[in-house]
Amino acid sequence: MLIFVSTLIIKMITIQNNKLKATFSELGAELTSLINLETGKEIMWEGNPDFWGGQSPVLFPTVGALKNEQYIFEGKTYELPRHGFARRRVFDIKNSSENEVIFELKSDEESLKIYPFEFSLEIKYTLVENKLTVSYRVKNLSDKEMYFSLGAHPGFAIDTENGMNYNDYEIAFSDDEKLEIHPLVNNLISNDTQTIELDNKTLPLSYELFSKDALVMTTMKSRELILRNNKNNHKVIFTFFNFPYLFKSFLTFDLIFKKVLTKINL
């Protein structure tokens, strides 16, 4: 499938096994569809631009916003947009098979103007039975320290048919948690915190919960979350490793997983 965006031709690629069918865009190496072949149910948020046009953007080389969208490195001021630039760049398809695809984005003349580091970002998507695994590899292609953040921002569809609504969903945590939430102030994370107590390791969803924007959690122990409907068996199990910070926002249901590495040399 081809999609025309301005003067660019964006290629879509699909991988599939006997359980799942996943579709990706070269633009941002973004997962745009994940279908349960047994039920025909679409798992991903549709990307309605009236609410949120994204579906599963990759956040690199920053997660969230910088103050005034600027930072200083080696005495020079650079401008970097919210969530970085990877989601707006066309990735190369490095390799693909029936059930796996590897995307790659490399630094170039344009990226060096706003992010003065030579890098390679590889994202591998693999279908294994009823699981989609995603792995990331960032390479520093120079001999100087490279600063970056890396985040995943998948949005999952909420079933509102057959009398279901947003309040019928909850998040189950793998560990006992006392969640410390950092509020967002002018799109920046505040040092202030508030505590949310879980009920039997679960957090019921409500629009009120997200009335002040996303929830930012920096001390969470759980490495598995389950988004589930408490009236039926519909659920999405999300496991993640080496991503210490969690953001949750209210549009349908989306997660931002953030990994911060101060330097990497490979």
Predicted regions, residues:
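Active-site pocket scaffolds in enzymes
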Residues: 234-266
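Short solvent-exposed loop/turn micro-motifs enriched in small/polar/acidic residues
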Residues: 8, 62-64, 84-89, 116-120, ...
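Buried hydrophobic-core signal for structured, non-transmembrane domains
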Residues: 24, 75, 134-138
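Acidic, contiguous internal or C-terminal segments within carbohydrate-active enzymes
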Residues: 107-154, 159-160
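Extended, loop-rich substrate-binding clefts of extracytoplasmic carbohydrate-active enzymes
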Residues: 77-129
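Beta-strand-rich N-terminal accessory domains
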Residues: 10-70, 77-81, 222-241
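Active-site/ligand-binding surface loops and adjacent short beta/alpha elements
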Residues: 158-243
